[in-house]
């Protein structure tokens, strides 16, 4: 399997859009339609979260989505069925967001074999410390799946250097302390870390956690970020809108964000 994440960053200009939704929200059929709609309306790469009962990195919106999906019977196997139904229907590379215990319980080798079958391009394991990730990284590299590394605002220079120089796919820079979602002004420290990373590696820098406004997007373009992850706003639409209109609303949000990334970069 050829990994297309690198090609996306090389071929697309400006700030790339990486929307996130939880698999199975609000139900499997509408979830599939929502993912296809994100692809058609401007997503460059799509992140998909596998529901988990203890998502320590996620805020209340995504926690709620995971809990509801689990109550509806969505587990790893059902998540894979949704992914199988997406094969050939979207052009954006898919990255799966999964917690480490889920991965261990399912079996790492079996999980990676399934990702290859489903043509998934990358994996994010938010609760796996970088220093403990080498075995998984080696297995991912062999299978041409990018294990995406995360960098926190609190990371030391030596840690940033180590992670940046061994990164695959892109570097996921967490824009704030705490969990996903929420609002607020971006810290100036983020600008410094983006600059630091880009001096250490040619790998793209993608910023996520709490990105939800045009002002933030404008700042990140000025700070030379290569991409943004938009998660909670997308999930919130699937949770709070009626089933008849949630895909339409999500399509509108993706279009609006895509226009912001384009218009502010001109």
UniProtKB/Swiss-Prot annotation:
Primary location recorded for the protein, binned into one broad class: plastid
Q: What class of enzyme is it?
A: lyase
One short Pfam name that applies is Trp_syntA
Q: Name one GO cellular component term.
A: cytosol
Q: Which UniProt keywords apply?
A: Amino-acid biosynthesis, Aromatic amino acid biosynthesis, Chloroplast, Lyase, Plastid, Tryptophan biosynthesis
Listed pathway(s): Amino-acid biosynthesis; L-tryptophan biosynthesis; L-tryptophan from chorismate: step 5/5
Entry EC no(s): 4.2.1.20
Task: State how it assembles.
Answer: Tetramer of two alpha and two beta chains.
Record keyword Disulfide bond present: no
The compartments listed are:
Plastid, Chloroplast
Task: Give the Gene3D superfamilies listed for this entry.
Answer: Aldolase class I
What is the name attached to this protein's record? Tryptophan synthase alpha chain
Molecular function terms from GO: tryptophan synthase activity
- InterPro entries from the xrefs? Aldolase_TIM, RibuloseP-bd_barrel, Trp_synthase_alpha_AS, Trp_synthase_suA
Q: Which PROSITE patterns match?
A: TRP_SYNTHASE_ALPHA (PS00167)
Q: Which positions are catalytic residues?
A: 47, 58
Record's family?
Answer: Belongs to the TrpA family.
SUPFAM superfamilies linked: Ribulose-phoshate binding barrel (SSF51366)
Which species is listed as the source?
A: Cyanidium caldarium
């Amino acid at each position: 399997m050829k990994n297309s994440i690198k090609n996306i960053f090389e071929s697309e200009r400006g700030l790339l859009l990486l929307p996130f939704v939880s698999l199975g929200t609000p139900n499997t059929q509408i979830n599939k339609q929502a993912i296809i709609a994100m692809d058609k309306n401007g997503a460059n790469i799509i992140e998909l979260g596998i529901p988990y009962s203890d998502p320590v990195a996620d805020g209340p919106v995504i926690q709620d989505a995971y809990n509801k999906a689990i109550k509806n019977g969505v587990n790893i196997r059902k998540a894979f069925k949704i992914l199988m139904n997406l094969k050939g229907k979207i052009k954006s590379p898919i990255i799966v967001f999964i917690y480490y215990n889920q991965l261990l319980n399912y079996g790492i080798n079996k999980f990676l074999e399934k990702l290859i079958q489903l043509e998934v391009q990358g994996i994010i394991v938010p609760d796996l410390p970088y220093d403990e990730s080498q075995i998984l990284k080696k297995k991912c590299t062999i299978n041409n799946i990018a294990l995406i590394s995360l960098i926190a605002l609190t990371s030391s220079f030596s840690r940033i250097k180590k992670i940046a120089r061994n990164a695959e796919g892109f570097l996921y820079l967490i824009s704030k302390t705490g969990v996903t979602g929420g609002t607020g002004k971006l810290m100036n420290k983020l600008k410094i870390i983006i600059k630091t990373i880009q001096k250490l590696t040619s790998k793209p820098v993608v910023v996520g956690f709490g990105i939800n406004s045009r002002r933030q997007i404008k700042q990140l373009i000025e700070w030379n970020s290569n991409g943004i992850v938009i998660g909670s706003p997308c999930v919130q639409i699937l949770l709070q809108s009626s089933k008849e209109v949630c895909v339409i609303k999500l399509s509108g949000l993706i279009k609006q964000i895509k226009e912001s990334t384009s218009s502010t970069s001109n």
